[in-house]
Amino acid sequence: MKQIFIGIIRFYQKCISPLTPPSCRFYPTCSNYGLEAIKTHGALKGGWLTIKRILKCHPLHPGGIDPVPPKKEK
């Protein structure tokens, strides 16, 4: 499942993103955030963090630096 999500994001980065002007308000970009979140937290939690991030990426949000939260140790 994790590899499927990573593949979808990579496809977006290589095939769709170059066709549109840069518009992400955050650093790292939403797609890079998604890759890092899924690699760090797995498909379920990383996917959820990515969805939350994409929903924040709009003209009314100031944007800025928003790193992936570190994985909590148990």
Swiss-Prot record:
**What Pfam families does the annotation carry?**
YidD (PF01809)
Keywords, A to Z? Cell membrane, Membrane
Instruction: Extract one GO cellular component term from the record.
Output: plasma membrane
> Has UniProt tagged this entry with the keyword Magnesium?
no
- List localization entries: Cell membrane
- The answer to keyword Ubl conjugation applying to this record is no
**UniProt cross-references to InterPro entries, sorted A to Z:** Membr_insert_effic_factor_YidD (IPR002696)
Q: How does it sit in the membrane?
A: Peripheral membrane protein
Q: Where does this protein chiefly localize?
A: membrane
Could you tell me what this protein does? Could be involved in insertion of integral membrane proteins into the membrane.
Family stated for the protein in its record: Belongs to the UPF0161 family.
Q: What PANTHER family would the database entry show?
A: MEMBRANE PROTEIN INSERTION EFFICIENCY FACTOR-RELATED
Q: What is this protein called?
A: Putative membrane protein insertion efficiency factor
Q: State the organism of origin.
A: Bacillus pumilus (strain SAFR-032)
**According to the entry, what is the taxonomic lineage of the organism?**
Bacteria, Bacillati, Bacillota, Bacilli, Bacillales
